[in-house]
């Protein structure tokens, strides 16, 4: 009886840990998706003319992006050791073998955003801003993001 309780308890703890790990992976993915919303759904679409240029939306997108990027280091502190179920992209285990190098990819993104913030005034300057920020996102993805499907 006592043994059964211990076994069931251990199993429950195991399930809890797996769920917590999936939750961490989801949080990390959600942060990236939120960044994508600002940079791709708003800014990139405007550069392509898919949606009309809107100064307020540009300024908001850059402000949101800045806030999100500042959360990357902390959000990726814990290794979830699993991917989000059905995700297209996953986090490389290299992140947690070399977290300092991973973190070093963040300030260049912040600098690219700071450099263009308040200076974007039209589609042409938005295009330049998009490229300079996106190139810095890519610098991290090349090493630390895995394509799963
Ligand atoms: C310091 C590293 C790093 C930086 C900087 C970074 N990312 Fe990521 N990104 C990752 C990792 C790791 C993943 C894969 C794991 C995940 O999705 O959480 C990822 C995944 C993504 C995904 C795929 C999400 C999905 O599952 O569909 C998008 C979109 C994305 N990032 C956008 C951005 C944008 C936009 C920026 C720049 C503003 C950016 N990222 C900056 C590390 C980074």
Identify the meaning behind each predicted range.
Residues 13-14:
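N-terminal leader/signal peptides at the extreme start of proteins
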Residues 21-149:
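Sequence context surrounding c-type heme c attachment/ligation sites in exported
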Residues 7, 17-18:
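Cleavable N-terminal signal peptides
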Residues 2-10:
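Sec-dependent signal peptide recognition
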């Amino acid at each position: 009886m006592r043994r059964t309780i211990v076994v069931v308890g251990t199993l429950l703890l195991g399930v809890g840990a797996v769920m917590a790990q999936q939750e961490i992976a989801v949080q990390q993915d959600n942060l990236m998706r939120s960044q994508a919303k600002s940079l791709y759904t708003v800014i990139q679409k405007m550069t392509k003319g898919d949606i009309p240029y809107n100064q307020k939306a540009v300024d908001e997108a850059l402000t949101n992006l800045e806030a999100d990027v500042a959360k990357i280091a902390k959000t990726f502190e814990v290794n979830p050791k699993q991917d989000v179920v059905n995700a297209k992209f996953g986090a490389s285990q290299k992140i947690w073998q070399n977290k300092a190098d991973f973190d070093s990819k963040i300030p260049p993104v912040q600098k690219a955003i700071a450099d263009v913030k308040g200076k974007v005034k039209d589609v042409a300057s938005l295009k330049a801003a998009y490229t300079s920020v996106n190139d810095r996102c890519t610098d991290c993805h090349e090493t630390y993001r895995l394509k799963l499907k």
